[in-house]
């Protein structure tokens, strides 16, 4: 269980930090502005994506509802796949479009470890609930 927690926190920290940094770069870097033009995206999309990345990074590290967390993972997966497709479509070299796919793997590792933590937490709460029921059942039966 400790190994899963460490894996989850490290991988999730990497994703959250990378998304926060890239959002900052999207908002401040002229080089990133030029890259979005190169990819054929309008300027406002860069800003929307930066805001979405900041919100998503917060949702990954904050204690939010499981559905919110899962939608955040789905959104980031779409971002990484779309980034790879955009770079491939514009003829960028493999070194450019491989990076989002590597982060997709890191995201997948974070998601799998998150699911394992959720299932172990669920099992613990059911075991505690189950023992409470049996004690109640025993007291009623007596």
Question: Residue ranges of each PLM-predicted region?
Answer:
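Membrane-interface extramembranous regions
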Residues: 1-142
